Amino acid sequence: MEQKTFCYNCGNYGHIFKNCHYPIISLGIICYHKLNDEYKFILVRRKDTLGYTDFIRGKYLLNKDSILNLVNIMTIKEKENILKYDLKKLWDELWTISKDEHIDEFEKSKEKLDIIRNNGIEEQNNGIKEQLKLVDIVKLSNTKYQDPEWGFPKGKREKDENNLEGSIREFEEETNLNKDHYKLLNLKPVIENYIGSNTKKYRHIYYIAKLLPEVKIELSENNIFQKTELSSIQLMSYEDVVENIRPYNKEKLAVLESVIETLKYLDEHKIDL
């Protein structure tokens, strides 16, 4: 029997990821805990920023705006690192245990980095040509982030997974929880749509779950995924989320506000899902 082509992005059959017309999709769970009439939500902080990750992978065009878009997302330390260290060191620290899976990207990324570090790229400034090197572009960045982005646990689907299956697996990998620690609510998932700094369209699909009592939220030394992908995990109130979410993540806050309104309605009407 002929095996059907599976799209790892949308989960449909008949085409592959690069031919998918949907936004780039991630799947996850927004999990809440209620204590003293206050809702708190599980958020995770990445090990590296999205801008830094895309830069190390060479996911940019050889022009100022494309590179600066990524640099502006980076932490202060990441900006220092891309100027200070060779790509091999940065690459190995980024991927840790899975670096061989992305080795095909390494040479292309190294070629780009050599160009912008050594030769620079030609840009027009008020009609005058100038050569900008990476160090010049980093100097143009005025962001001063200390930590990588916070967000809800999520990730990409695996082979033959539907939305719910992928959401559960990603959530459990990132939180180190299992089905005995939370209860999925019988609600339609909430959708977060946005356009990234790379001008691509993204869609995050979140199911809603309730954290069961007495469950601890913490990083585990025995969880390889957490050790290599995350730098922190916390239960946050809405005010905490507002304080920690980056200013350009307005869509994420809108999704959270929608979830809170739904939870309040369920509580007020004593609806148990």
Label every model-predicted segment.
Residues 1-25:
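A short, cysteine/histidine-rich metal-binding "knuckle" motif
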Residues 9, 18, 71, 83, ...:
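Nudix hydrolase/Nudix homology domain
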Residues 12-15, 34, 176, 180, ...:
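Short amphipathic alpha-helices and their capping/turn residues within compact interaction modules
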Residues 23, 36-38:
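Extreme N-terminal segments of fungal proteins
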Residues 27-31:
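Short beta-strand scaffold segments in enzyme catalytic cores
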Residues 39-169, 173:
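Conserved Nudix-box catalytic region and its N-terminal flanking loop in Nudix hydrolases
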Residues 41-47, 187-190, 206-208:
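Extended hydrophobic secondary-structure segments that form protein cores and membrane-embedded regions
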Residues 178-189:
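A short coil-to-beta-strand element that immediately follows conserved catalytic motifs
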